[in-house]
Each structure stands twice: as structure tokens, then as C-alpha cells.
From Swiss-Prot:
Catalytic activity: (S)-dihydroorotate + H2O = N-carbamoyl-L-aspartate + H(+)
GO MF entries: allantoinase activity; dihydroorotase activity; zinc ion binding
Enzyme Commission (EC) number: 3.5.2.3
Protein name per Swiss-Prot or TrEMBL: Dihydroorotase
Family the UniProt entry places it in: Belongs to the metallo-dependent hydrolases superfamily. DHOase family. Class I DHOase subfamily.
Taxonomy of the source species: Archaea, Thermoproteota, Thermoprotei, Desulfurococcales, Desulfurococcaceae
HAMAP family the UniProt entry points to: PyrC_classI_A
Binding site for Zn(2+) 1: H61, H63, K146, D293
Alphabetical list of InterPro entries matching this protein: Amidohydro-rel, DHOase, DHOase/Allantoinase_Hydrolase, Dihydroorotase_CS, Metal_Hydrolase
Gene for this chain: pyrC
Listed pathway(s): Pyrimidine metabolism; UMP biosynthesis via de novo pathway; (S)-dihydroorotate from bicarbonate: step 3/3
EC class (word): hydrolase
């Protein structure tokens, strides 16, 4: 599309709010932003819809599945779901099949994303077998390495990753749980007891100690913290930390009954008390980012007995609007923007997120009219514990100057996403 214009009711530039504003887009950049209407008919006119344009939303934690797990989700369906939810960039996790623990598997995943992604993307690698593989994978344009609880038993491999990440200037991301502290039945109302909060905080301390032992100082990020103590421990150690919408807004009592596997997720949903404290820490500014942990499965898998059903549920079609409807008033627009856009971009190292003259034309437009969560038909995961709950919706998604989605046309065709580390900022 040549130079074109989008107009909205409200536009947040990254430091101030404008009303009845238009952005003139030329190529992949915002040429100028102005208020007071537009002479003629804008190419994309979203006024009169309670529309709010923000610098593009980033999701630091998604599972697009793909490869041999494409029956759950794939790179096309997952990124289409992201576009429909106003997410402009996703960071894909490595626990697919084969797991992204070798350069060969990582190349296959990157090729699949290049062929099908409808939003921009980056990837985390798993913990490889050797330091040499870690160095090679760190040079392949990844966002960082992901450490899972089962990886923590091999500290030599962890130290290899810490060293390689520091050398390459990329992230080390930790799933904060320690398996050796799990106890009891791992399903239903007992999950938060079986996977206790102190297992989260202990894993953060363990990773900090491993980094100290090897003399490494990589950038460490703690993802999907479900407990207040995990957030506090992370900040104490100088790590960044994110939380998920489900840990902020759902409690075990609401959706994780003894026969209900739709709400089964790792780390588990907590009680009302932990959830309230986690929300308070978020409001107070201790949480750096919101990330979805979009973790799709087939419907038949989630109808299995809760003891064996896989953990996780889909979020990409809805989480920005769902979160904005519940949190934006409490934290303010500036803080909300920081947690879903600017700070994730800084942590991932993918360039600034702003919306004024000269900024990248990557824009999320939320519609601030309450609706209810429904299946939009993009993700392959046709279940969610938040079905029917109130939410804002996505009006439009623009990625590097191209319209990826509008609420009335849906997701546009073609693979338009690129590896975020290759975007010129």
C-alpha cells in the first residue's frame, strides 16, 4: 500500500494522548500524526468506535506449536490469531516436536515461521547439549534461551547457556518452578499445593546462584510468575519479570475444579489471595510485562482426565483486550502501554514502540466497547475458560505499514511477518 491514513478516536503516542487523531503512513514508517480531523476520506477510518491506537502490542511468551505438533496449532493459525487480537509480534517457545534444542530443529522452525507468519516474530531456543551448539544457536537471530524446570537438574548445561547468552547479548528466560519441590496429586484443586509458590521463588534463586558460579551476567527474564514471592525474588535479583492475564484475573476456585481440565495450566492458577497480591504488585509497578503464555491443544486432549490432560489454553485472539478491560483503568494508560508494548520491546531488543512522526508503523487499535469473548476462528484450539467473559476487542492491527487485520475483513492473506531481529528500526 502506498502512503495512506488511519484515523481513530484516541491515539496514544507513547507519552501523550491525542483525540480525533490521524496517522499518515508512508512505507513502513509513520510520516506524521495530527489531530483535528482529516480532509477527505481516510483509508482506514475507525472513528466512532471508541477506538484507541497504541504502539504495537508484543507477546513475549507464546507456543505456536507447529512442526510435529501442528494438529494443536501452527505458525499460520497462531499468528493469524495474534493479528486478530491486536498482537503485532510474538516470541515463540521451544517446546515443540522436535524441541528446539539443536541448530537443525531451530532452522526448521525459523523456516516454518518465515513461510507462514502473519505477524512479526522471534524465537527462543531450548537448552542444547553442548556449549558449541549454544553459541551456534545464539548466532541465529533468536531472542534467547528458555530454561524449563527439568533443565535445572543439569547445572553444567545451564552455565553453557548463561555464557553463550551473555556473549551474544540475548536473553535467558526461566520457567520458574523446581520439580524437586513438587508433592501430591497434580490435578484439580490440589495443583497449587502440588506445585507450591516456594518452588517458583527457589528456582529464581537457583538460576541466580548458577550465574554467580560461572561469573556470567546475562540478561535474565522470569516468565509467567504466578506468585507474589516470585515477583519480589526476581526484582531482588535484578531480573525482569512478566505475568499472564490468567494468573492476574482467574483463580483456581473459579476454573480449576477436580474434573475441569480447561483451566489446567503451568504454573497453576492460584487462590484468590495470591491473585489479589499479584495484581497489587502489578499495579505498584513491580511487574515489567504482561505475556499470554498462549498454549493451545486439541479439544480432545483438554477433555481428558485432569490428571493427564496437557496444561495450557489459548489467548492470542483476546488477551490484549481482555487485559485492557480489567487493568488499564487501575494502572493508567502509560503503564499499560509500557507492560504490553514498550518494555517487552526493550527486553527483547527489537526496537522502540512509539506512535509519532518517524516511528515504525506498527499499531494496535483496540475498540473500547465491552463485548464478550467468543471464538474468532483463527486458533485451532477451540476451548477457553474465559469464553463469554467481558473484554474489549481488536479493531485493527497494522504491522510495518501493512494492514494485517480489521474487525470487519478479518486477517489478510499472505505471510507478512518477519524475524524481529532483522527489522530495521
Amino acid at each position: 500500500m502506498a502512503g495512506w491514513t488511519v484515523c481513530v478516536d484516541f491515539l496514544y503516542t507513547g507519552d501523550k494522548m491525542l483525540e480525533d487523531a490521524c496517522a499518515v503512513i508512508s512505507g513502513e514508517r509513520v510520516e506524521r500524526v495530527h489531530t483535528g480531523g482529516f480532509r477527505g476520506q481516510p483509508d482506514l477510518d475507525l472513528r466512532g468506535r471508541s477506538s484507541l491506537a497504541l504502539p504495537g502490542v508484543i507477546d513475549m511468551h507464546v507456543h505456536l506449536r507447529g512442526l510435529k505438533l501442528s494438529y494443536k496449532e501452527d505458525e499460520v493459525s497462531g499468528t493469524a490469531a495474534a493479528a486478530s487480537g491486536c498482537v503485532t509480534l510474538v516470541a515463540d517457545m521451544p517446546n515443540t516436536q522436535p524441541p528446539l534444542r539443536t541448530p537443525e530443529a531451530l532452522r526448521e522452525k525459523l523456516a516454518s515461521l518465515e513461510a507462514g507468519a502473519k505477524v512479526d516474530y522471534t524465537v527462543y531456543a531450548g537448552v542444547p547439549r553442548s556449549y558449541g551448539e549454544a553459541v551456534e544457536m545464539a548466532s541465529m537471530g533468536i531472542a534467547g534461551f528458555k530454561i524449563y524446570p527439568e533443565d535445572l537438574v543439569n547445572l553444567d548445561s545451564i552455565k553453557n547457556v548463561l555464557e553463550a547468552a551473555e556473549e551474544a547479548g540475548i536473553l535467558v528466560v526461566l520457567h520458574p518452578e523446581s520439580h524437586d519441590m513438587f508433592a501430591g496429586p497434580d490435578y484439580g484443586w490440589l495443583r497449587r499445593v502440588a506445585r507450591p509458590c516456594h518452588a517458583e521463588a527457589a528456582s529464581v534463586e537457583l538460576l541466580h546462584d548458577a550465574a554467580r558460579e560461572c561469573g556470567c551476567k546475562p540478561r535474565v527474564h522470569i516468565t509467567h510468575a504466578s506468585c507474589p514471592a516470585t515477583v519480589v525474588e526476581s526484582k531482588k535479583r535484578g531480573f525482569t519479570v512478566d505475568v499472564t492475564p490468567h494468573h492476574l484475573f482467574l483463580s483456581e476456585e473459579e476454573v480449576a475444579g477436580p474434573t475441569h481440565s480447561w483451566g489446567k495450566v503451568n504454573p497453576p492458577l492460584r487462590g484468590v489471595g495470591e491473585r489479589s497480591l499479584l495484581t497489587q504488585l502489578t499495579i505498584e509497578g513491580l511487574v515489567d510485562a504482561i505475556a499470554s503464555d498462549h498454549a493451545p491443544h486439541s479439544t480432545w486432549e483438554k477433555w481428558m482426565h485432569p490428571a493427564i490432560a496437557p496444561p495450557g489454553f489459548p489467548w492470542l485472539e483476546w488477551w490484549p483486550g481482555f487485559t485492557a478491560a480489567r487493568l488499564m483503568r487501575a494502572v493508567g494508560l502509560e503503564r499499560f502501554y509500557s507492560m504490553v508494548s514498550q518494555t517487552p520491546s526493550t527486553i527483547l531488543g527489537v526496537g522502540d514502540r512509539c506512535l509519532w512522526d518517524g516511528c515504525p508503523a506498527t499499531i494496535s487499535v483496540l475498540q473500547l466497547e465491552r463485548t464478550r469473548v467468543y471464538h474468532k476462528g483463527y486458533t485451532k484450539a477451540l476451548y477457553t475458560p474465559v469464553l463469554g467473559m467481558e473484554s474489549f476487542d481488536c479493531a485493527a492491527t497494522v504491522i510495518r505499514g501493512k494492514i494485517a487485520y480489521t474487525a470487519w475483513e478479518g486477517v489478510r492473506g499472505g505471510a507478512t511477518g518477519v524475524l524481529a531481529t532483522r527489522v530495521v528500526h
